[in-house]
Regions:
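Outer-membrane beta-barrel "beta-signal"
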Residues: 382, 443-457
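Detector for outer-membrane/organellar transmembrane beta-barrel domains
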Residues: 223, 267-283, 290-400
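Signature for the C-terminal beta-barrel architecture of outer-membrane proteins
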Residues: 143-311, 315-317, 324, 443
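Membrane-embedded beta-strand positions of outer-membrane beta-barrel proteins
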Residues: 32-34, 74, 109, 152, ...
Length: 457
């Protein structure tokens, strides 16, 4: 998915897990930020300009140290305002974990964010960290959600390290369609997520090679995909008027296996990066509307850095294994117009036939969401990032084009740093696509211009 991938690592990676500030052997260091932001979009129904999001936010970031072998990190966010035409007042513990490091062996326990993958905009290997692509924040890293996990690591010499992660608590990502208005008769029932039994946990293994000439990694993941599928429950129709009464669906988690690899190779001022992954569901996807097909996904990019300009150009592709064409149009609705042509063609509409028709539509919608309606997908992307006037003015222009679906994503922004710690940022996040594409569905709701002011301390 393009938008969710647009917060990948590389150019935009700024997680607290990787970069909390410390000062010598201080027992506790404090930092954080205060941010105000406003997003202007169009209402989904009448397409009138409105405040899509307007909020004030405080982030408090702490790092504590106990001797030379124990550290603890916390990132706490407070946010108040309005979003998607609803008031918000929330407290979020984004990260809170403890690290123990003794010699080559380390342990981490708690809630943290550490995505897999080295790509800038697409990370096929990142199945372990969930995301919220509807997040209204000028910092793309805020789309990453924390997981509660136990991680152990062992250094095998100067360049190799093995990490094993066990995540017993399922943390779903947020679907792009969450802010999209649905017909009144479409009901999302309580989600079907795994419990806290030990055999419901997920685990991942990562082998890192960090050498002067090469940065590479191998990955294995066995657990629940962070994106739940949309499962069909039931459909009720008035048989006299053929009008829908209720379409009941629910989010349902499913388990996958994933194997992947990536590498990054610096050559002078150039960096060559590639990443690829294979995954399949542990259950057969045949006739199960919420399960995706097995797939191979892969990306390759070239980065060139200069004195004031960085250019990243890349390719992202997918191959859908065991592909078969969808049997219906992708839809999360069941209107009268969908059944009348069948009746006029002589088909006898029974409850069983209606269930099959609606289930096939939901299956196609899941494939639309997962980009599996076609056997192959090809996308290209370009990121331009310029720094001017001694790094007081920054311009960033990420662009993505999907050749298969003819969809666009553009997220230009300009940042001004008039004083130390102060950033004023303005930009636009836009998604466009033709009829029956995901961007055509979510773009009119998510597209927005924004301005934010952030003071970091």
């Amino acid at each position: 998915m393009c938008l969710s991938a647009a917060s990948g690592q590389g150019l935009f990676e700024t997680t607290l897990s990787e970069g909390a500030n410390t000062k010598g052997d201080d027992a506790l260091t404090l930092g954080g930020f205060i941010r105000s932001a406003v997003y202007l979009g169009n209402t989904p129904d009448e397409e009138k300009p409105y405040l899509q999001s307007a909020y004030g936010q405080v982030g408090l970031q702490m790092k504590a140290r106990a001797g030379t072998w124990a550290t603890a990190v916390a990132d706490i966010r407070f946010r108040y305002g309005t979003e998607w035409q609803q008031n918000i007042s929330e407290l979020n513990i984004r990260e809170a974990y403890v690290d123990l490091q003794t010699g080559p062996v380390g342990f981490r326990l708690g809630k943290y964010i550490s995505p897999w993958g080295k790509g800038t905009l697409f990370n096929p290997t990142n199945k372990i960290i969930p995301m919220d692509p509807t997040t209204r924040s000028p910092d793309p890293d805020d789309m990453n959600l924390g997981i509660w996990a136990l991680q152990g690591s062992v250094r095998l010499g100067s360049y190799l390290q093995v990490r094993a992660t066990w995540n017993p608590l399922y943390q779903p990502g947020k679907l792009l369609i969450d802010p999209i208005p649905m017909p009144d008769y479409v009901n999302f029932l309580d989600p079907d997520y795994p419990g806290v039994e030990l055999d419901d946990g997920s685990y991942g293994i990562q082998l890192d090679l960090r050498a002067p000439a090469l940065d590479a990694a191998l990955y294995w993941f066995d657990g629940y995909h962070s994106w739940p599928g949309i499962a069909y429950d039931s459909f009720i129709m008035d048989t006299l008027t053929m009008e829908p009464v209720a379409l009941n669906v629910l989010e349902k988690a499913y388990r996958i296996r994933m194997a992947g690899l990536d590498f990054s190779l610096p050559v002078g001022s150039w960096i060559f990066t590639a990443e690829g992954a294979w995954f399949e569901t542990t259950e057969s996807h045949d006739s199960v509307e919420y399960l995706p097909f097995p797939e191979l996904s892969y990306s390759a990019e070239i980065e060139k850095s200069g004195a004031w300009l960085t250019v990243i150009a890349g390719y992202y592709g997918k191959y859908i294994i065991d592909f078969t064409p969808a049997l219906a149009e992708p839809n999360l609705s069941a209107e009268q117009e969908q059944f009348l042509p069948l009746m006029q063609g002589g088909m006898h509409i029974t409850s069983e036939a209606v269930d099959v028709i609606v289930q096939e539509q939901i299956s196609a919608f899941n494939r639309l969401y997962n980009y599996q309606l076609e056997e192959y997908y090809h996308s290209t992307y370009l990121v331009l990032k310029g720094n001017f006037f001694h790094n007081t003015l920054e311009l960033s222009v990420p662009l993505i084009y999907n050749f298969t679906t003819e969809e666009w994503i553009a997220q230009p922004s300009v940042s001004w740093m008039p004083a130390d710690g102060l950033k004023v940022q303005a930009g636009y996040s836009g998604l466009w696509g033709g009829a029956n594409t995901l961007n055509d569905l979510v773009g009119p709701v998510l597209n927005a211009a924004y301005i934010s002011m952030t003071l970091t301390f």
